[in-house]
């Protein structure tokens, strides 16, 4: 299966439905490295710890001085799971809708100097057998939020972190959201988010497009 390319145009009202309405059936929200499940007040979403989704890796906490201050993101960027052992470590997702459905999958990465090395790692991310992206953070205090639209041919989706020899892979959070398949009608495979534009927002926004 080839990894196709798409431009995702986000309209604020649509994204509020996709990301902030916990009542939508089929959400999977994982706070990687968390010791327990919790309700995130900033997003109104219930996050589960990654116990049961993966059995490898090590839980780590971000030092308070590196807490990410953006109010749109809550506790899930205050801890992470790192993978010092093995070349390939995978999360196992079992969405309620099963195979041949369309899903938006988003991964969160925030280094925050959790290991006190001041050295941002670089590693690859796969969904199933498809290369998704290379996680290459700008600095220790800048997060990354890559997302992808994926239509699996199996009831199980594997999201895998691949050690490429440039530092220990880690992940802060992982989310899956079911989509109406008519939005991006593909039978199988993946669509990678190339750009995102905010239409109709304040002209002060540097990514403003009307």
Located regions from the model:
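Compositionally biased, intrinsically disordered or flexible polar/acidic segments
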Residues: 1-210
């Amino acid at each position: 299966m080839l990894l196709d390319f798409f431009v995702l145009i986000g309209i604020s009202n649509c994204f509020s439905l996709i990301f902030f309405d916990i009542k939508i059936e089929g959400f999977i929200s994982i706070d990687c490295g968390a010791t327990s499940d919790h309700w995130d007040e900033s997003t109104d979403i219930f996050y589960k710890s990654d116990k049961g989704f993966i059995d490898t890796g090590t839980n780590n906490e971000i030092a308070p001085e590196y807490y990410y201050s953006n109010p749109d993101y809550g506790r899930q960027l205050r801890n992470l799971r790192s993978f010092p052992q093995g070349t390939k470590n995978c999360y196992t997702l079992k969405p309620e809708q099963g195979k041949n459905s369309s899903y938006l999958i988003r991964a969160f990465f925030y280094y925050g100097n959790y290991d006190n090395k001041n050295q941002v790692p670089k590693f690859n991310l796969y969904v199933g057998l498809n290369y998704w992206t290379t996680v290459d953070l700008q600095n220790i205090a800048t997060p990354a939020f890559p997302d992808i639209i994926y239509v699996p041919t199996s009831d199980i989706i594997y999201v895998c972190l691949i050690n490429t020899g440039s530092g220990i892979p880690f992940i802060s959070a992982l989310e899956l959201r079911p989509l109406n398949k008519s939005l991006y009608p593909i039978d199988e495979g993946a669509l990678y988010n190339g750009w995102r534009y905010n239409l109709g927002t304040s002209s002060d926004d540097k990514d403003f497009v009307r």
